[in-house]
Amino acid sequence: DLWSWGQMIQETGLLPSYTTY
């Protein structure tokens, strides 16, 4: 799901804007 992307992105720090998901 998209929420997983927010978690992974937050960890990687590639796209902080995606943390909203």
UniProtKB/Swiss-Prot annotation:
List the GO biological process terms.
Answer: lipid catabolic process
Group of enzyme by EC: hydrolase
- Temperature-related behavior of activity: Optimum temperature is 35-45 degrees Celsius.
A single GO molecular-function term is: metal ion binding
State the activity regulation: Inhibited by crotapotin.
GO cellular-component terms in the record? extracellular region
Q: What does this protein's record comment on cofactor binding? A: Binds 1 Ca(2+) ion per subunit.
| Keyword terms, alphabetized | Calcium, Disulfide bond, Hydrolase, Lipid degradation, Lipid metabolism, Metal-binding, Myotoxin, Secreted, Toxin
Indicate where this protein resides in the cell: Secreted
Would the keyword Nucleotide-binding be found if you checked this record's keyword annotation? no
The UniProt PTM text for this protein says:
Contains seven disulfide bonds.
Name of the molecule in the record: Basic phospholipase A2 BjIV
Summarize tissue expression. Expressed by the venom gland.
Activity-pH dependence: Optimum pH is 8.2.
Q: What does the record give as cofactor?
A: Ca(2+)
Q: What does this protein do?
A: Snake venom phospholipase A2 has a high enzymatic activity and produces moderate myonecrosis in skeletal muscle, but shows no neuromuscular activity in mouse phrenic nerve-diaphragm preparations. PLA2 catalyzes the calcium-dependent hydrolysis of the 2-acyl groups in 3-sn-phosphoglycerides.
- Tell me which EC number(s) this protein carries: 3.1.1.4
Q: Which family does it belong to?
A: Belongs to the phospholipase A2 family. Group II subfamily.
Q: Which domain of life is it from?
A: Eukaryota
Which reaction is catalysed here?
a 1,2-diacyl-sn-glycero-3-phosphocholine + H2O = a 1-acyl-sn-glycero-3-phosphocholine + a fatty acid + H(+)
* Quaternary state and interactors: Can form dimers, trimers and tetramers.
